[in-house]
Curated annotation (Swiss-Prot):
The lineage of its organism: Bacteria, Pseudomonadati, Pseudomonadota, Gammaproteobacteria, Pasteurellales. It catalyses: tRNA(Ala) + L-alanine + ATP = L-alanyl-tRNA(Ala) + AMP + diphosphate. SMART domains: tRNA_SAD (SM00863). It is found in: Cytoplasm. Consists of three domains; the N-terminal catalytic domain, the editing domain and the C-terminal C-Ala domain. The editing domain removes incorrectly charged amino acids, while the C-Ala domain, along with tRNA(Ala), serves as a bridge to cooperatively bring together the editing and aminoacylation centers thus stimulating deacylation of misacylated tRNAs. It comes from Haemophilus influenzae (strain ATCC 51907 / DSM 11121 / KW20 / Rd). Zn(2+) binds at residues 563, 567, 665, 669. The gene is alaS. This is Alanine--tRNA ligase.
Length: 874
């Protein structure tokens, strides 16, 4: 019986024997594709090839692509672990033809791999196929050439409500490449319920789709017209877990070798004995998606990809809690995962320390609120009468206790209760603090400038070139000429201008002739051409005309210093903080550099000083900045670091600075590190959960920054009648003095508050025999109000006190209740009622509670509401 690892390798070996290039799985974070949250299919990394925007040195490829499909807007995730084939993470085996072979070979390859005794050797009589209803070519290949009997070939038409909307017709989008597909199904046998595709029983588990072969032969236009593609292509996908289940003679993916091992290890760690428990399946699935997402650079956070990761981790933690886990357990599965994934586990192994650390930190963070949140949910569920949990409760769990909605849905599912998701959505919309992941992703590929050909870049060695204009764009439209005063995009045949990429800003400068001046404000890349964005200030320009292209050399030079310093900073961070540090974003301009990186913990001042010192040491070492062009595999073998989110071709540019830094980079750099002169960090802070940002300056900008700091220090010392050397000591003396005065003032306020107590006791009103004081006292801080309330409780013996005070444009509320009344009157309940009137919230003990608010105009109303509520409840 083949293991999953052996099946993966045999697939790649088979297609390699058929002339396919074996291509590594791409990252789960799609490169240069804002339309996708995660890589979810094998074709994602080849999307630009299919669109004609990218060229590869091969026309046949095969991959074992890791994919993540975490579910839809809310609670699709709750099904993972409860069905036989629903996963957050899976591997997609695929073979691809880019204008090479088409239907005949694609179908023959699939059949040979599945049925040949040399490969998988599946019984031919167990295989069924579907084709698009009008795809006679595919039908005839299956029937006449391959020999599949007609009764096992099913034509599927438009079954989704509109033309070409079918299970057997695939499209990349509303427009663009599309075409029919043929799917191969495996019949598990009549001991399992279900019918063949297209039948009323097709949702059963007997007939399972194992391979989808897409024939991209049309280009769909905006009006729905289908044009034949000049070079049709093939895109296929076969789920590794599904074919493993077939070959290992099991009906559920969770029974294949990978999952059996992960489930057994989970049970061992948490002390579970029932290996059929659904929670074990959930955890075994989730460790795969979570570990690989972190290895590919995703950090748990409250938005976008990071929030999807957080949802999955928290669901796994909750299921561990159900199994009886008493301590952090999830991260302990990583070594087992690496082992069972075999060759495909190498990316997680390379980041193992960071993966385990982030999983443990996230689990520990959630554990602090898990118990309280579950207690609140349990109480709310016990009061449900109509089988529906209110959206308000679900939102409170989300907002206060960090419960993703699908986690709450998981708990509800176990009690046959649903959630009022519409009410939840209304609360989310009102809050507007956490964006839905899907709202952050989406781009219309047809809206960008599209030009055939490519621009030859000469900027590595030149800052001035003669160049011919190949296209002009005015107001987003292609034009033949532009006139003075018009802003436009100029496309050149060759250029010294660097187009923005890799974090480095685009060059500026000008294009000119004797009678023409076009000021270039920015340079951007559109496919393979460079667009020079700016304004024509003199003369006219037309397509075909030659111009002098002249880069702003000083701006370029300063930018190059900052770019080289960014590489030194990256290497220094990894040396001092650890190899888990990976770039998450950067901006390199002529003024400064900004570098975002993965780092789960705050950086100490000492570490920051070490980092800065190390970078400056490497600057003084005056390493040559060496550039080499090589293939991607050689670069990786040399130890070159590929950056998160960047897209590389087969030939890459490797930038080396001594033995300290080696990275893939297409940017402009200094000739030697000594050219940078000086490196100074000016800010360091967190920009998101697990992501830190450093901003720094170099060269003359660093010197100017230090001069400005010195000027500020000198002015500050003069104001305090001190000198720079004793300034810190002088400030400390002033702070100590201020604290002493503040303490004395607070004592006087508290004394005055206690003396005022007798007045309030006399002004107390009786409600059903209970003394009540409800007053507005402006200008008094919360601490003094609390002292006053405590004193009044002692003086009254029995009573309720509610104070509101306006101070520094804020409302402070304090409520006190004597112990004999807390069974009837809760201070927290009353203070929250008052807080609602002033746009705030608060809480506390039954006998003492505080709140704040911002709506000063409603303070009188808050006091009145308190009086009315006490009249009603006493």
């Amino acid at each position: 019986m083949k293991t999953t690892a052996e099946i993966r390798q045999s697939f790649l070996d088979f297609f390699h024997s058929k002339g396919h290039q074996v291509v590594e799985s791409s990252s789960l974070v799609p490169e240069n594709d804002p339309t996708l949250l995660f890589t979810n299919a094998g074709m994602n990394q080849f999307k630009d090839v299919f669109l004609g925007m990218d060229k590869r040195p091969y026309s046949r490829a095969t991959t074992a692509q890791r994919c993540v499909r975490p579910g839809g807007k809310h609670n699709d995730l709750e099904n993972v672990g409860y069905t036989a084939r629903h996963h957050t993470f899976f591997e997609m085996l695929g073979n691809f033809s880019f204008g090479d072979y088409f239907k005949q070979d694609a179908i023959n390859f699939a059949w040979e791999y599945l049925t040949s005794p040399q490969w998988l050797g599946l019984p031919k009589e167990k295989l069924w196929v579907t084709v698009y209803e009008t795809d006679d070519e595919a039908y005839n290949i299956w029937n006449k050439d391959v020999g599949v009997p007609a009764e096992r070939i099913i034509r599927i038409g438009d079954n989704k409500g509109s033309p070409y909307a079918s299970d057997n017709f695939w499209a990349m989008g509303d427009t663009g490449p599309c075409g029919p597909c043929t799917e191969i199904f495996y019949d598990h046998g009549d001991h399992i319920w279900g019918g063949p595709p297209g039948s009323p029983e097709e949702d059963g588990d007997r007939y399972i789709e194992i391979w989808n072969v897409v024939f991209m032969q049309f280009n769909r236009l905006a009006d729905g017209t289908m044009e034949k593609l000049p070079r049709p292509s093939v895109d296929t996908g076969m789920g590794l877990e599904r074919i493993s289940a077939v070959l290992q003679h099991v009906n559920s993916n969770y029974e294949i070798d990978i999952f059996k091992t992960l489930i057994a290890k989970t049970a061992e760690i948490v002390g579970a004995t029932d290996l059929t428990n659904k929670s074990l399946r959930v955890i075994a699935d989730h460790i795969r998606s979570c570990a690989y997402l972190i290895a590919d650079g995703v950090i748990p956070s409250n938005e976008g990809r990071g929030y999807v990761l957080r949802r999955i981790i928290r669901r796994a933690v909750r299921h561990g809690h159900l199994l009886g886990a008493k301590e952090s357990f999830f991260y302990k599965l990583v070594p087992t995962l690496i082992d069972v994934m075999a060759e495909a586990g190498k990316d997680v192994k390379a980041k193992q320390t960071n993966v385990e650390k982030l999983l443990r930190l996230e689990e520990e963070q959630f554990a602090r609120t898990l118990e309280r949140g579950l207690s609140l949910l349990d109480e709310a569920l016990s009061q449900v009468k109509d089988g529906i949990l209110s959206g308000e409760v679900a939102f409170k769990l989300y907002d206060t206790y960090g419960f993703p909605l699908d986690l709450t849905a998981d708990v509800c599912r176990e009690r046959n209760i649903t959630i009022d998701e519409q009410a939840f959505d209304r609360k989310m919309e009102a809050q507007r603090t956490r964006a839905q992941a899907a709202s952050q992703f989406g781009v219309d590929y047809n809206s960008v400038i599209r030009v055939d050909g490519e621009t030859k870049f000469e900027g590595y060695t030149e800052v001035e070139s003669q160049a011919k204009i190949t296209a002009l764009f005015y107001d987003g439209k292609s034009v033949e000429s532009i006139e003075a005063g018009q802003s436009a995009v100029v496309i050149l045949e060759n250029t010294p201008f660097y187009a923005e990429s890799g974090g480095q800003i685009g060059d500026s400068g000008y294009l000119s002739t004797q009678s023409v001046t076009f000021n270039v404000k920015d340079t951007q890349k559109y496919g393979q051409v460079f667009g020079h964005i700016g304004e024509l200030t003199q003369g006219s320009l037309k397509v075909g005309q030659s111009v002098n292209a002249i880069v702003d050399a000083k701006r370029r030079h300063n930018t190059s210093l900052n770019h080289s310093a960014t590489h030194l900073l990256h290497a220094a961070l990894r040396q001092i903080l650890g190899l888990h540090v990976v770039q998450k974003g950067s901006l390199v301009s002529d003024k400064a550099l900004r570098f975002d990186f993965a780092q789960p913990e705050a950086i100490t001042k000492e570490q920051l000083s070490e980092i800065e010192t190390l970078v400056n040491q490497k600057i003084r070492a005056n390493f040559p900045v060496q550039t080499d062009i090589m293939d991607i595999d050689s670069a990786k073998a040399k130890g070159a670091m590929a950056l998160f989110g960047e897209k590389y071709g087969d030939k890459v540019r490797v930038l080396t600075m001594g033995d300290f830094s080696i990275e893939l980079c297409g940017g402009i750099h200094a000739k030697r590190t000594g050219d940078i002169g000086l490196f100074k960090i000016i800010t360091e802070n967190a920009v998101a959960a697990g992501i830190r940002r450093i901003e720094a300056v170099t060269g003359q900008n660093a010197i100017d920054w230090l001069h400005n700091q010195q000027r500020i220090l000198t002015q500050s010392a003069d104001l305090l009648k001190s000198d720079v050397n004793t300034l810190a000591e002088k400030i400390q003396q002033l702070q100590d003095k201020a604290k002493k005065v503040e303490k004395e003032l607070q004592g006087l306020k508290e004394k005055a508050a206690m003396q005022a107590g007798s007045y309030f006791v006399k002004s107390a009103v009786k409600i059903n025999g209970v003394s009540v004081i409800a007053q507005q006292l402006d200008g008094i801080e919360t601490k003094s109000l609390r002292v006053m309330v405590d004193d009044l409780k002692n003086q009254l013996g029995s009573g309720v006190i509610a104070f509101a005070s306006i101070l520094d444009e804020k409302v402070n509320l304090v409520v006190g209740v004597t112990n004999d009344l807390t069974a009837k009157i809760k201070a927290g309940e009353l203070v929250n009622l008052m807080a609602q009137q002033v746009g705030g919230k608060g809480g506390g003990r039954p006998d003492m509670a505080m709140a704040g608010g911002s709506q000063l105009e409603n303070v009188t109303q808050a006091i009145k509401v308190a009086q009315d509520w006490l009249n009603k409840n006493l």
